[in-house]
UniProtKB/Swiss-Prot annotation:
Region named Head domain (RuvB-H): 258-338
Region (Large ATPase domain (RuvB-L)): 4-184
GO cellular component: cytoplasm; Holliday junction resolvase complex
Function in brief: The RuvA-RuvB-RuvC complex processes Holliday junction (HJ) DNA during genetic recombination and DNA repair, while the RuvA-RuvB complex plays an important role in the rescue of blocked DNA replication forks via replication fork reversal (RFR). RuvA specifically binds to HJ cruciform DNA, conferring on it an open structure. The RuvB hexamer acts as an ATP-dependent pump, pulling dsDNA into and through the RuvAB complex. RuvB forms 2 homohexamers on either side of HJ DNA bound by 1 or 2 RuvA tetramers; 4 subunits per hexamer contact DNA at a time.
Keywords: ATP-binding, Cytoplasm, DNA damage, DNA recombination, DNA repair, DNA-binding, Hydrolase, Nucleotide-binding
Similarity comment text for this entry: Belongs to the RuvB family.
GO terms for MF: ATP binding; ATP hydrolysis activity; four-way junction DNA binding; four-way junction helicase activity
The UniProt record lists the keyword Isomerase: no
Annotated protein name in UniProt: Holliday junction branch migration complex subunit RuvB
Reactions accelerated catalytically: ATP + H2O = ADP + phosphate + H(+)
Length: 338
C-alpha cells in the first residue's frame, strides 16, 4: 500500500491541494491549536514589524498534516510580505536555490518543505544566505572560473520537516525559532471540522463533528479528508445532514474505527501480538511480516500507535502494550508486563 493512498495518511495528496487552500486560515487568530507556538509567533512577528526587520528563520517539525505549510503562509500574511514555496527534493542544484534567493523581495518568506532532503551542495549555499544574507556563486568554468559574492535582501527562511533527526547540526543551528508541532486534541479537531464544514457548506451537528474529529488521529488534514468522505455518504445514503450516527456508519464503511486505526494499523498490531508474542520484535522483521516498507512503519504507522500507548519502542525492538491486547480482544499472557 502506498502511504498517501491511506485514508488516514497525514501526507498530502496532489488532488487535495486546491481544497486545502480553500479551507486554510489566513491569520494566527483563525488558526486552531498549537497554542504555545501561536503565542510565541505572535510576539516574534509583532517585534519584527516594529523593528522593520526580517523575522528570524523558523524551523517547524512534526508528523505530516499538522499545519506546517499553513503556518508558513500565515506568517507571510501577518508580516505583509510575499511567500515563495519549494521543497528539498526540487532544489537539485545550488543554482536552483541561488535563483530563488536572488528573486526575493526584502523581508519575504521562503518556505522549504522536506528541508531534510536538501543535497549537501544546496545546503552549503544556504549557510551564508541564512547568516549573512549573501551567497557565493561561480562564474565561468575551468581555470578561468571565479567566485563572486552576491548580497541578498533580508529574508525569512521557514523550513519544514517530518524527520528533524536527519537535519545536519550546522543547518539546525541557523534557525532562530524552532518548534515541534504536536498532535491536536479532540476538541480542537472538532472546531476544525465545524469550520471546514461551514466553508464546504455542509450541514453538520456538533456530535457529528466530534465523531469525525475523534477518528482523525490528531491530524487536521485527516479530519478534513474524513469530513469530505462523510459528506459524500450523507448526500447519497442520508439527507445531507452529518450526525454522529451517520458519521459512525460512514467511517465504519471506510474501515476507520473509533480510534482512527485502519487496516494497516490493525495488521501491525496483530502481527506483533499473534506472530511474535507481543515482542520485542525488530522493525525489519515486522515490516516483512506486515508487507510494508520499514520507513512506512517507522515514520507513519508507529508514531501514532506509540503516542496512543499501543506500542513501546525499546532497545530490543517493538513491544505491544496491554492496550494493544485489549484492542485486539486477545488475553494478555500471564507474567507479561504492560
Amino acid at each position: 500500500m502506498i502511504e498517501s493512498d491511506r485514508l488516514v495518511s497525514g501526507k498530502a495528496r496532489s488532488e487535495e491541494q486546491v481544497i486545502e487552500r480553500a479551507v486554510r486560515p489566513k491569520r494566527l487568530t483563525d488558526y486552531v491549536g498549537q497554542e504555545s507556538l501561536k503565542a510565541q509567533l505572535s510576539i516574534f512577528i509583532e517585534a519584527a514589524l516594529k523593528r522593520q526587520e526580517a523575522l528570524d528563520h523558523v524551523l517547524l517539525f512534526g508528523p505530516p498534516g499538522l499545519g506546517k505549510t499553513t503556518l508558513a503562509a500565515i506568517i507571510a500574511f501577518e508580516l505583509g510580505v510575499g511567500l515563495r514555496q519549494t521543497s528539498g527534493p526540487i532544489l537539485d542544484k545550488a543554482g536552483d536555490l541561488a535563483a530563488l534567493l536572488t528573486n526575493l523581495e526584502p523581508h519575504d518568506v521562503l518556505f522549504i518543505d522536506e528541508i531534510h532532503r536538501l543535497s549537501p551542495a544546496v545546503e552549503e549555499v544556504l549557510y551564508p544566505a541564512m547568516e549573512d544574507y549573501q551567497i557565493d556563486i561561480m562564474i565561468g568554468e575551468g581555470p578561468a572560473a571565479r567566485s563572486i559574492k552576491l548580497d541578498l535582501p533580508p529574508f525569512t527562511l521557514i523550513g519544514a520537516t517530518t524527520r528533524s533527526g536527519l537535519l545536519t547540526a550546522p543547518l539546525r543551528d541557523r534557525f532562530g525559532i524552532s518548534h515541534h508541532l504536536q498532535y491536536y486534541h479532540h476538541d480542537e479537531l472538532t472546531q476544525i471540522v465545524m469550520r471546514s464544514a461551514k466553508l464546504f457548506e455542509v450541514a453538520i451537528d456538533k456530535e457529528g463533528a466530534e465523531e469525525i474529529g475523534r477518528r482523525s488521529r490528531g491530524t487536521p488534514r485527516i479530519a478534513n479528508r474524513l469530513l469530505r468522505r462523510v459528506r459524500d455518504y450523507a448526500q447519497v445514503r442520508g439527507d445531507g445532514m452529518i450526525t454522529k450516527a451517520l458519521a459512525d456508519e460512514a467511517l465504519e464503511l471506510l474501515a476507520v474505527d473509533h480510534l482512527g486505526f485502519d487496516a494497516l494499523d490493525r495488521r501491525m498490531l496483530l502481527c506483533l501480538v499473534e506472530y511474535f508474542g507481543g515482542g520485542p520484535t525488530g522493525i525489519d522483521t515486522l515490516a516483512v511480516s506486515v508487507g510494508e516498507e520499514r520507513g512506512t512503519l517507522e515514520d507513519v504507522v508507529e508514531p501514532y500507535l506509540i503516542q496512543q500507548g499501543f506500542i513501546q519502542r525499546t532497545p530490543r525492538g517493538r513491544v505491544a502494550t496491554e492496550l494493544a491486547y485489549q484492542y485486539l480482544n486477545i488475553e494478555v499472557p500471564d507474567g507479561r508486563n504492560s
